[in-house]
């Protein structure tokens, strides 16, 4: 009589010595994914930081160039010249024509200009970018006083090309964007302090034990100009201030 075979199991048995996966592969994958995300985040933050550094440096360099251009414009304003060395020509207020304060040419002009600036009763004693010697703190760009601080000085400062006719560029010939920006509190300005000195300085001994005329000067009138130029960058945190002393030395006849 034939023997009946037992029914085969639908679920085969695992051979002895083998083990089922306990989820370690998934854990390893998650760890690598998290590490990849951290590396990507670090790379993006590094790139953003480098971009900020480069952007800040570019803005500072642009503001420095604008301040240097303002100093040169102030020198031309003092000499009454154009950038090519020719005499200043144009319509008011270019070349300080019209009812604006003018550069002194003779000694009497110095006295008249200083007397006119003395009549300013409120705020900085300045007119059209010409100022008396500042008293007190010299770094007005760091002051918050409404009457003598930066905001008050900006109101009496001179923009690039106002009295020299220098062009700030256009779309076809772009110039420094800071110089083109004339919005309130933006762009650049310069101020010229008129500092008279005694004519006896020309014959004074400038170096102890030196000759009386060790440095012969021929200045008419006897005035030194202290020029301060300030350029506000495209970012609020960028500001460049340059200052120089300028003496217009005249050739003897």
What residues fall within each predicted segment?
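Terminal alpha-helical segments
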Residues: 2-6, 11, 16-253
